[in-house]
Amino acid sequence: MSRYIITLKPIDKFFFGGDMTFSVGNNPNDNYNREYSSYLIESAYFPQQTSLLGMMRFLILRNNEECFDGVKITDTIKAAGLIGEGGFGEGRSYGKIKSLGHCFIKDCADNKDYHFAPYDSDYAVSAAEDTCLVNGRELTLHKMEGFSSKVWYKKYLECGSEKKEVSSFFVEDRRIGINRDIKTGKTEDAALFKQVSYRFSDSRYAFAFHAETDVDILPYDGQVVSVGADNSQFVIGIKNDHEDGNAGCSALKVTLLSPARLLSKDMDKVAFCMTEVMPFRYLRSTVHTKSYNVLDRELSRSERIEMYAPGSVFYFSSEADAEAFRNALNSYEDFRRIGFNEYK
């Protein structure tokens, strides 16, 4: 098994979809459009881990002539052995792809890696002497010097002691328009749309993540790949990676480096936290899928899951409680395998 550092340099603007899309098809009142569509769609800053998995699966597939002819899969058995039976899902294997790490930003000129900084990086957090009862449990109160509930906290990416606001890495690309019927030229119902995509603020930046595979992917370095449902295009860079990749952990504090799947029971040991949640869905497909139209039965959306956002911080009263929380994060193996639930 080989470990790689993979970079994605955007060719143009990029758009990473989230929970909502534009209206699909001609019926704005069908079930899909009622649940998922909006006239205002804004890209996420980072690609979803499932999008990186899909990109890697297709990269390996399209470079294998034994099971792919450039247009479609020709041998589903060989394809399943190469990239797995299907995309993300419980208990799934992804063939030659063994694991993916969380996505971060790399400064390719200075070889700096920027990861999400903890939400409390602007504040001095300490445990006060007072305690309180919450659901019958006695908890130590925490205080954050400098925090005001009237001023929303800033989000940063950090590289060592250096930190920059997340928004400083990106520049908005706004597109506003009206949809017209392609045959008649008449304005369609609910035709107004606004799409916010992004570009990097400096050409030196690229998305990056680590990957472990059982197939040599170095020959694919420099190819053009598509990421996300909007097919944003990137030039992929692939190099051997010999670093450990394991971030050190604080004894009584856990910071999320990636979105994380956690249930309410997993929060029982947390004494104090500063978090946000974000929606997560993914498309279900297999090597037998012929149509990738979201309205087709062959391609369906998963149920919505609430994930804890990267940068979320959790404090604990004892090392045992902190270790129990880390074990909970590690227990979601399907999510861990593709870069979710990573922490320091």
Per-segment meaning from a language model:
Residues 1-344:
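Conserved active-site/ligand-binding neighborhood in enzyme cores
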